[in-house]
């Protein structure tokens, strides 16, 4: 494939050599957070994204299905210089199939805020060959302040039927800690453990319900936490690593504060 000509080997976050063409002019992003980061910084490079890439609003590029089922044939037809993936968001088999088709793939690994800042720097400077985005150091400064004390026991569900929650070694868990939350299920062996309804609320002082991947709403979710403050938050603020980090700390802090000061719902009651 032509994208391999005139390339030089770079090493992605997983240690894989990636023959990156210079200059990079055509990028397909299979990660919503990274799509927003690239579109906000160098929109001219982005030639396709997934159906889940909702930001920035009005993003007008071809879509190549989802993060877990990308249209590999369509991606190959677009002849990208680079495809951007993430270890957690995308499947290894899809990365391998793209590479087998001689398409360069850069995989990021992000499980903490610090890893996010480092991975974003490497993506832009090493993989894309651009300058470090100006919003990155600004976002680092936003999150440099220590977390409020004491930490409050929290649960962050990501699914129900069955209930699944944020556990250990996750970007969302690290971000939550910096907001003053202690995830009560962080000691479990799985990163996103399944829990029973009883386990769901044990030791929980506040429940944080995002609108992705499961769409929790005031009518779907809060009733499972009777007597416990519930914060309904944007999944983008809680789980995305990109320009949203500039405002996410203030937004989430305000939402957590409001939840703690609102009367907790009684059994069967919908929180206001």
Show the residue positions of the predicted features.
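N-terminal ligand-binding lobe of clamshell/alpha-beta domains
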Residues: 1-272
